[in-house]
UniProtKB/Swiss-Prot annotation:
This is Methionine aminopeptidase 2. Its EC number is 3.4.11.18. It is an enzyme of class 3 (hydrolase). InterPro entries: Creatinase/aminopeptidase-like (IPR036005), Met_Aminopeptidase_Type2 (IPR050247), Pept_M24 (IPR000994), Pept_M24_MAP (IPR001714), Pept_M24A_MAP2 (IPR002468), WH-like_DNA-bd_sf (IPR036388), WH_DNA-bd_sf (IPR036390). It comes from Sclerotinia sclerotiorum (strain ATCC 18683 / 1980 / Ss-1) (White mold).
């Protein structure tokens, strides 16, 4: 998501809800609730010449069964458009596609062939299958989104279209208590335009329309049992922005290349910075060096917690903290034609309950009621105002602000560089397996 912010900044998508439920239910029941054609047990008799049968003798008959008819409603083999087929129907074995596997380098190269490390890797199968399922959902949803997002659409249409697809493919519409905690949308869909780098998702009534000249960062997450896949890409229709996007994409790939067990976080940031600053982009006749946004970082990911505590800088730093075996990281980079530094601005949409929130008395009744809704529907997963609207909550802003002021809920306002600048983002989730590094969200697109 949702980049982690440093310095003074804080650390840290809906159509008719019924349509989402119907879509998910329809996909989930595909092959189960539709009437199935019965295999025929009728037999036909086929005359054959019997051995030693005399002329005019009776012909022996050989029984031949009809071929069984194909069952109506058999599990689909391909995803629908828009994506609405439950992913487990496409992978009935429960085995999901493996991400990009990258061998460890240097002193960790032995891990590739170590029998002990391969054994430990096999022990993580359930953990990995949940991550791979979430990653495949992310790939299928973004494939459709990238092909269908066009100028003229509202940001609300774009965000809710992505979120509806995620809910359908996970089979978790998120309207029943606890359903979204089992799986579904991991955090609000970010649709960040131009100088807005992160944490912008439309609130109710937002009429902002995507234009041809915009640069939009699309940052969305999928989770299965709290295993969060966090991946982001940037869309630009005008080719003059191509170098900006390429700089950030390659910087992210550099970060992935340098990441690994025992890799020092500060050194990863140095390599990312070198890659990004090697690019220039000409926009409207003016040339800019692409700058890393120095107070935005990648981060580790824990179960049901998008920011675990470790930060992966995108500029050189003295951080000697090492990555460790079994950890999961979001490697994300942001490039800008502006100051290369973001600040809080605009109306807030992103919120999350603080994991170790204080137990304090709440004088505002609506705050206690809202906290109960948050606990039962999101836990520590980030949410936005639209998600509360979708659950039928109203007149909740006073209570929400009270939870924020008491330190129970953290607000995450949009993060912006200077107005008139352009920013880009690319992000992948990686798993540091015992015997290799798996770029779990890697696809053919990025």
């Amino acid at each position: 998501m949702a980049a982690q912010v440093t310095d003074a900044l804080k650390n840290l998508k809906v159509k008719d809800p019924n349509s989402v439920i119907e879509s998910a239910a329809e996909a989930k029941s595909n092959g189960n609730t539709q009437a199935e054609a019965e295999d025929s047990d009728d037999e036909e008799e086929e005359p054959v010449n019997g051995e030693g049968a005399g002329e005019g003798g009776a012909k022996k008959k050989r029984k031949r069964k009809k071929k069984p008819k194909k069952k109506a409603g058999a599990n689909p083999k391909v995803q629908s458009s828009p994506p609405r087929v439950l992913l487990s129907n496409l992978f009935p074995s429960g085995e999901y596609p493996v991400g990009e596997e990258v061998e460890y380098r240097d002193e960790n190269n032995y891990r590739t062939t170590s029998e002990e490390k391969r054994y430990l890797d096999r022990m993580n199968n359930d953990f990995l299958q949940e991550y791979r399922q979430a990653a495949e959902i992310h790939r299928q949803v973004r494939q459709y989104a990238k092909a269908n997002i066009k100028p003229g659409q509202t940001l609300t249409e774009i965000a809710e279209g992505i979120e509806d697809s995620v809910r359908a493919l996970t089979g978790h519409p998120g309207l029943e208590e606890g359903d979204n905690i089992k799986g579904g949308v991991a955090f609000p869909t970010g649709v960040n335009l131009d100088h807005i780098a992160a944490h912008y998702s439309p609130n109710a009534g937002n009429k902002t329309v995507l234009a041809y000249e915009n640069v939009m960062k699309v940052d969305f997450g999928v989770h299965v049992n709290g295993r969060i896949v966090d991946s982001a890409f940037t869309i630009a229709f005008d080719p003059m922005y191509d170098n900006l996007l390429e700089a950030v994409k390659q910087a992210t790939n550099t970060g992935i290349k340098e990441a690994g067990i025992d890799a020092r976080l500060g050194e990863i940031g140095e390599h990312i910075q070198e890659t990004m600053e090697s690019y220039e982009v000409e926009i409207k006749g003016q040339t800019y060096q692409v700058k890393p946004i120095r107070n935005l970082n990648g981060h580790d990911i824990l179960q049901w917690k998008i920011h675990g505590g470790k930060s992966v800088p995108i500029v050189k730093s003295n951080d000697q903290t090492k990555m460790e075996e079994g950890e999961v990281f979001a490697i994300e980079t942001f490039g800008s034609t502006g100051n290369g530094y973001v600040r809080d601005d605009l109306e807030c949409s992103h919120y999350a309950k603080v994991a170790d929130a204080p137990n304090v008395p709440l004088r505002i009744a609506s705050a206690g009621k809202l906290l109960n809704v948050i606990n039962k529907n999101f836990g520590t997963l980030p949410f936005c105002r639209r998600y509360l609207d979708r659950l039928g909550q109203d007149k909740y802003l006073l209570g929400l602000n009270a939870l924020v002021s008491h330190g129970i809920v953290q607000d995450y306002p949009p993060l912006v560089d200077k107005k008139g600048s352009y920013t880009a983002q690319f992000e992948h989730t990686i798993v540091l397996r015992p015997n290799c590094k798996e770029v779990i969200s890697r696809g053919d697109d990025y």
